[in-house]
UniProtKB/Swiss-Prot annotation:
It comes from Arabidopsis thaliana. Its main location: plastid. The keyword Plastid applies. Disruption phenotype: Impaired chloroplastic NAD(P)H dehydrogenase (NDH) activity, probably due to a reduced stability of the NDH complex. GO terms for cellular component: chloroplast; chloroplast thylakoid membrane; membrane. It is found in: Plastid, Chloroplast thylakoid membrane. Residues 1-49 form a transit peptide. Keywords: Chaperone, Chloroplast, Membrane, Plastid, Thylakoid, Transit peptide. This is Protein NDH-DEPENDENT CYCLIC ELECTRON FLOW 5.
Length: 354
C-alpha cells in the first residue's frame, strides 16, 4: 500500500546539513511567516456562501472571492461545489490550492533553462461515484473517522504578485473542539511554504497524533532520484500510512515501527521501495532528480521527524506515475499542547535552480 494523500472533489533560517554543500538563498534562510498587516479577511458580514466550507448547503461564492481579493496575486476557479485558488507571482512561480481541503495540487517554478517545471505530483481517479485527486501537499492527522474532519475555509489573503502571496485557511476539529487549526500558504519567488498552526483553546492539555505535511514530488524515475544531506541521520522503517481526507489511517496490525538504523549515505538513491521515518535529520536537505536535471530543497520547522516514501523501481520510468513522498511529520511522537499554547510546524519547498 502506498502512502496517499487525497481529497474528494465532489464533497464538499535553516541550518545546512552537516555534509551538504548546497547553499540556500538568503530569502529562504529567513522566511517571515507571520501574516501581513494589510491582510484582507472575510468579515462576519459576508454572506454564508462566501465564507462557509464547500457543501451542498453552502457552496463557495466564487464571484465574491474574485471581487474581494483581486489584485492580491490570486484568482479563483469554480469546480463544482469547491474552488481552486491560483496563486501566481510576476516571476512565473505559481501554486494551486483546493480551498475546502487545504490541498496544494500544483507548484510550478522557473528553472535555469528559462522554462517552468511542475514540482508536485498529482493524479485523478474515479472512486465509486466521486472524483478523487491524489498527491500534492496536504496536512493529515491520525483519527478513526474521516467524518471528524471539517473542511478548510478561507480566512484571508495578503501580499501581491510582485514579492509574496499569502493565504490563510482555518478549520475546526469536530472531535476535539478545543483545537483551532490554521494553515498559511506562502508563495515567494523561489519558495513555497506551508505553515500549520494549532492552538489549544481548552483548559486541559491535549495530544495530537500522526500529524504530517507530506509532499508528493514528481520525478523522472526513482532510480535517478537522490536525497542529499541525510548521512548520519537516525531512522525507523515503518509501513506506509494512508491519509484519507486529512486523516492518517495506519494498518492496525502493522502499526509498530520496525527496523531502525543510521543513514550511511549522504547521497541516498531512492531506487528501492522504502517507507522510513527519520527521527534525527537536518532541518533541510536536497532532493536531486538527475533525469529532469532538477532539485528541490526540503526544509522544516517545528516537526522533529521526516517521513520518506519511495515506490521504488516498480513504477514505470519517465511517466506521470513516478514520484517520491517526503515531508515533516510527528508520526512517532505526538504533539503535546498545554492550555493556551500554540504549536506551529512548517514545510518549505525551495527551488534553487532559477
Amino acid at each position: 500500500m502506498a502512502l496517499v494523500h487525497y481529497m474528494n472533489v465532489s464533497r464538499s533560517t535553516f541550518p545546512l546539513s552537516r555534509s551538504s554543500k548546497i547553499n540556500l538563498s538568503s530569502s529562504f534562510a529567513s522566511l517571515p511567516l507571520q501574516f501581513h498587516k494589510n491582510i484582507k479577511r472575510l468579515e462576519s458580514s459576508v454572506p454564508p456562501s462566501a465564507s462557509a466550507s464547500a457543501s451542498p448547503a453552502f457552496p463557495i461564492d466564487v464571484e465574491y472571492l474574485r471581487r474581494e481579493f483581486s489584485g492580491h496575486g490570486a484568482t479563483f476557479e469554480d469546480i463544482g461545489e469547491t474552488c481552486i485558488a491560483r496563486l501566481k507571482l510576476d516571476n512565473g512561480s505559481s501554486a494551486n490550492v483546493m480551498l475546502t481541503r487545504g490541498m496544494i495540487t500544483s507548484y510550478k517554478v522557473r528553472v535555469w533553462h528559462g522554462g517552468k517545471v511542475e514540482l508536485l505530483h498529482t493524479w485523478v481517479e474515479q472512486e465509486e461515484e466521486e472524483v478523487v485527486i491524489r498527491g500534492g501537499v496536504s496536512s493529515a492527522f491520525r483519527s478513526s473517522d474521516s467524518d471528524e474532519i471539517s473542511d478548510w475555509r478561507l480566512q484571508g489573503i495578503s501580499g501581491d504578485s510582485k514579492d509574496c502571496v499569502q493565504m490563510e485557511l482555518r478549520r475546526s476539529d469536530k472531535k476535539i473542539k478545543e483545537i483551532e487549526l490554521k494553515q498559511i500558504i506562502s508563495l515567494r519567488e523561489n519558495t513555497l511554504s506551508i505553515e500549520l498552526s494549532m492552538t489549544n483553546k481548552g483548559i486541559s492539555p491535549i495530544k495530537l497524533e500522526g500529524c504530517s505535511l507530506v509532499s508528493y514530488l514528481t520525478v523522472s524515475t526513482p532510480e535517478a532520484t537522490y536525497a542529499v544531506g541525510l548521512e548520519g541521520s537516525d531512522f525507523v522503517e515503518t509501513t506506509p500510512f494512508l491519509p484519507r481526507f486529512g486523516v492518517v489511517q495506519g494498518e492496525k496490525e502493522e502499526e509498530k515501527p520496525g527496523f531502525g538504523g543510521e543513514e550511511e549515505s549522504n547521497y541516498k538513491q531512492l531506487n528501492r521501495e522504502m517507507s522510513r521515518i527519520y527521527t534525527c535529520a537536518p532541518k533541510s536537505f536536497t532532493v536531486i532528480d538527475r533525469g529532469r536535471r532538477n532539485s528541490v530543497v526540503v526544509g522544516r520547522e517545528g516537526f522533529e521527524e521526516v517521513y520518506m516514501y519511495s515506490p521504488g523501481s516498480r513504477l514505470e520510468s519517465y511517466t506521470k506515475s513516478a514520484y517520491v513522498c517526503i515531508g515533516p511529520s510527528s508520526l512517532l511522537s505526538p504533539i503535546s499542547l498545554e492550555s493556551g499554547c500554540v504549536w506551529r510546524g512548517v514545510l518549505h519547498l525551495h527551488n534553487p535552480n532559477s
